[in-house]
Amino acid sequence: LKKSLFLVLFLGLVSLSICEEEKRETEEKENEQEDDKSEEKRLLSLVPHAINAVSAIAKHFG
């Protein structure tokens, strides 16, 4: 009885460990996707400033 109880507890811990690892990997992927989206937003927010700068330079030299 002790051996089977030990085996059940051991397998439960292994299963829990695997689930935690998968959860951690999923969270890391989600965080990477959020980081990518925030980078895209930052770059897109720079576009109007770049356009204004180009147009100002064109007016200055044009």
Curated annotation (Swiss-Prot):
Record's GO cellular component terms: extracellular region
GO BP: any one term: defense response to bacterium
Signal sequence region: 1-19
Source species, domain of life: Eukaryota
Keywords recorded for this protein, A-Z: Amidation, Amphibian defense peptide, Antibiotic, Antimicrobial, Cleavage on pair of basic residues, Secreted, Signal
Chain positions listed as propeptide in the UniProt record: 20-40
Residues the record lists as Phenylalanine amide modifications: F61
Tissue: Expressed by the skin glands.
Similarity comment: family membership: Belongs to the frog skin active peptide (FSAP) family. Phylloseptin subfamily.
Record's protein name: Phylloseptin-Az7
Naturally occurring in which organism (per UniProt): Pithecopus azureus (Orange-legged monkey tree frog)
